[in-house]
Amino acid sequence: MNAFDVAIVGGGPAGSACAWKLRQSGLDVVVIDKAVFPRDKLCAGWITPQVLDDLDIDPNEYRQGRTFQAITGFRVGVIGNGDTVDASYGRAVSFGIRRCEFDHYLLCRSRARLRLGTAIASIRRDGSRWVIDEAISAPMLVGAGGHFCPVARMLDGSPDRAPRVAAQEVELPIDRKGCAVGGEAPELYFCPDFKGYGWCFRKGDYVNVGFGRVDWRALPEATNRFVTFLKTTGRMAADPSTWRWRGHAYLLAGFRQRRAVGDAVLLAGDACGLAYPQSGEGIRPAIESGLMAASTIVNASGRYTRDRLEPYGRQVRERFGSGMMGHLLSQLVPDGMSSGVALRLLDTPWFVRRIVLDRWFLHARDAALV
C-alpha cells in the first residue's frame, strides 16, 4: 500500500492546479487518471490572462514548442443569418491552446506523483484514510475527474436530472485555403433559440470546430445546421462527412451543483459542475476551484472533517453559484420570441462586446483569486 497526504482523482486542469498548490506547501500528493498523458482532449481551448496569473505561468516559456495563439478579437453572429459583428480589442484578451499540450504541461509542472493509465475500480474508507484500489491510501481525497468522476458519484450520486450541456467537437490540421477563419479572432454563432452555439477557432496549425447545446436531444440536428452554415457562408470548405466528432457532457454552474464537500473529500472543476452557464467554459472554473480546494486543505492542517472543509463549499457557491444562472442567454427572452430577439441583440455591437464577450466569455469583471 502506497501512502500519500492527498490523493487527487483526475489529472486535468482542476486536479493539476490543486496538486501544484498542495506541493508548494510540502504535501505528498498523488494524481490518478485513467488516461495516459499527453492525452487526446478536444476543447475549444482558449484561456484568459487571469489563468496564467493564477498559475504563475510565463507565456514566453509556455509557448516554446506549444500552440499559444493570441486572441485579439471575435466574430459573433446567429446561425442561419449572414450578418456578423466583429469586435476588435487591439490587444491579446485570451490565448488559444491545445488541451493535449496544456493539460500535460500542467500535470508535469505540478510535481505530484502520478498514477496514469489507471481506471479506478474501488474507493473505500478505512478508519481515517481513503483506500483506492487497495493500492493507494490518503487521509484526504479530491475528486477532479470531470463529469463522470467516480469520486463525484460516490459523494453525490447520479446527476442525471441536473441540466447539462452536450457538445460535439472536432480538431483538424488546418487547410489554409479552405478555412476563412482568422487565427486571432475565433468565430461564435448562436442558435436562434439561444439554447446553444457553435464555434470555429483556428489555433496555429489546427482548427477546432464545435457545437454545444443545453437541449441535448436536438444536438445532432443543430450541429448539422451549424456545419452547413459554415460551408454555405464560406467559413469552412472541408467535407464534414469525413470529420470524426468527439462528444462530451458537463453540468453548468448555478443550476444544480454537485455537493462539493464531505468528510475528508472535496470536488473540483467539472466533477463539481462548475462550467460557466453562458459560455460552457470549464478551464478557468476548474483551475480556480482546484486552487481554492488546495488552500482549504492546507488551512485544515490535517483535520479534514466536513466542518473544517466547508469554507471551500461556501467559496464555490459564492463564486460559481446561483447568481450565474440568471445570465444564461436563453433566459433573456420567451421561447416564442427568441429568433427575432437573437438577431437584434447579436447584431448590436455594444451588446456583443460588453455583454456576450466581456461579461460572459472573457469574464473581464470577475475579481482575481486572492
Regions found by a protein language model. Give the residues of each.
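Glycine-rich FAD pyrophosphate-binding loop
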Residues: 23-43
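A conserved beta-strand/loop capping segment in the N-terminal third of enzymes
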Residues: 46-105
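N-terminal Rossmann-like FAD-binding beta1-loop-alpha1 element of flavoenzymes
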Residues: 4-30
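C-terminal helical "tail/cap" subdomain of flavin- and related membrane-associated enzymes
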Residues: 295-370
